[in-house]
Swiss-Prot record:
EC category: hydrolase
Described function: Component of the glideosome complex, an inner membrane complex structure involved in parasite gliding motility and host cell invasion. During the asexual blood stage, may play a role in the assembly and anchoring of the glideosome complex to the inner membrane complex. During the sexual stage in the vector mosquito midgut, protects gametocytes against host alternative complement pathway-mediated elimination by interacting with host complement inhibitor factor H.
InterPro entries: Acid_PPase, Calcineurin-like_PHP_ApaH, Metallo-depent_PP-like, Metallophosphoesterase_PAP
Domain notes: The C-terminal transmembrane and cytoplasmic domains are required for the trafficking of the protein to the inner membrane complex.
A Pfam family reported for this protein in Swiss-Prot or TrEMBL: Metallophos
Cofactor note as given: Binds 2 metal cations. The role of the metal cation is unclear.
Keyword Protease: no
Record-given protein name: Glideosome-associated protein 50
Reported cofactor(s): a metal cation
The organism's taxonomic lineage, starting at the top: Eukaryota, Sar, Alveolata, Apicomplexa, Aconoidasida
Organism: Plasmodium falciparum (isolate 3D7)
Membrane topology: Single-pass type I membrane protein
Residues reported to bind a metal cation 1: 195
Length: 396
């Protein structure tokens, strides 16, 4: 079987690290959300997930959050072994690869700091270079990576730019992965300085990405658009979406809703992959821009190439690909790879942010409550005016 040979390099530039994979074909990664629930669905999904990881020659995994449906109590919580290490291990080591993840709504209900601490101590600085340590006892399951509540990961891969390598040579494509915490970005997040820094860092990340990356993928828990039970987030649609559109983001990968879906809007695909261990049906009305929706337990496999991005939705109920979505590569006028190192220098430092323990999260963002309240007030005024008009006519 022919497969891609990869070489893993990491360089440390001034205040941040950049990880580079040199891949002599397409770049493949998988996405899996809301996976940490002790169910038959998780076991079945993990079975097919490991098969596809091996057969598709996936390079790394991204998780949009809600890793542990009931959260974790700490670093010694049995959930780490029972719901992660044992479930996603593979004897031959095929599953040992980076597992990039962020916190989701349900993770914040437990000891969220433990999940951050689990991802520390991975990056070792030696003479200005950063490397990922390979633990002797961690070769059979994915390597947990979460250096901060939000962070970025830049990579590149090489493809043939034409049918004849001799005539046309190779073409280098860059991909930027930006991981966000949608709760930290929420207006309801109690620590405003951290909230503001997360937004400022995101703007800087997107500003750099659109200058050096052919592909931009943003990963976060809550969907912006959804036909699932959340119906998406009006707050993210108002504040986050314009930033993503301005940067010409290709994919926004989310979880939160326990289903699989793709909604395409202005050349950006909104991918929901939140059925890693359980599933729920769609809400009463399907989003008008939804191209595909499934309540099956499953996951996604993504392939980046010279032509664009192909996303395969895999159903573990059926054990096969049930939908394939294709997004053409964009010709971004903002690209300036000649000055890539200069742009890299503008990236924010990736370091662990100290977030104190806090109380339960609010059920709704302040934005939603305020807009809803205004709507009720307007409605009340209309009803009052209508009633007054009716009484006035009948009193004459």
């Amino acid at each position: 079987m022919n497969y891609c040979k990869t070489t893993f390099h990491i360089f440390f530039f001034v205040l941040f690290f950049i990880t580079i994979y040199e891949i002599k074909c397409q770049l493949r990664f998988a996405s899996l959300g809301d996976w940490g629930k002790d169910t038959k669905g998780q076991i079945l999904n993990a079975k097919y997930f490991k098969q596809f990881i091996k057969n598709e020659r996936v390079t790394f995994i991204v998780s949009p959050g809600s890793n542990f449906i009931d959260g974790v109590k700490g670093l010694n919580d049995p959930a780490w072994k029972n719901l992660y290490e044992d479930v996603y291990s593979e004897e031959k080591g095929d599953m040992y690869m980076p597992f990039f993840t962020v916190l989701g709504t349900r993770d914040w209900t437990g000891n969220y700091n433990a999940q951050l601490l689990k991802g520390q101590g991975i990056y070792i600085e030696k003479n200005g270079e950063t490397s990922i340590e390979k633990d002797a006892d961690a070769t059979n399951y994915p390597k947990w990576i979460m250096p901060n509540y939000w962070y970025h990961y830049f990579t590149h891969f090489t493809v043939s730019s034409g049918p004849s390598i001799v005539k046309t040579g190779h073409k280098d494509l860059a991909a930027a992965f930006i991981f966000i915490d949608t709760w930290v970005l929420s207006s309801n997040f109690p620590y405003k300085k951290i909230h503001e820094k997360a937004w400022n860092d995101l703007k800087s990340q997107l500003s750099v990405a659109k200058k050096i990356a052919d592909f931009i993928i943003v990963v976060g828990d809550q969907p912006i658009y959804s036909s699932g039970y959340s119906r998406g987030s009006s707050y993210l649609a108002y504040y986050l979406l314009p930033l993503l559109k301005d940067a010409e983001v290709d994919l926004y990968i989310s979880g939160h809703d326990n289903n699989m879906e793709v909604i395409e809007d202005n050349d950006m695909a909104h991918i929901t992959c939140g059925s890693g261990s359980m599933s729920q049906g769609k809400s009463g009305m399907k989003n008008s821009k939804s191209l595909f929706f499934s309540s099956d337990i499953g996951f996604c496999v993504h392939e980046l190439s010279n032509n664009g991005i192909v996303t395969k939705f895999v159903s573990s109920k059926k054990g096969e690909v049930i939908y394939t979505h294709k997004l053409n590569i964009k010709k971004k006028k903002t690209l300036d790879k000649v000055n890539a190192l200069q742009h890299f220098a503008a990236l924010p430092n990736v370091e662990l942010t100290d977030v104190p323990s806090s109380g339960p999260m609010g059920n709704k963002d302040t934005f939603v409550r305020v807009v809803g309240t205004i709507g009720i007030l307007i409605g009340s005024v209309i009803v009052f005016i209508g009633a007054s008009s009716f009484l006035s006519k009948n009193m004459k």
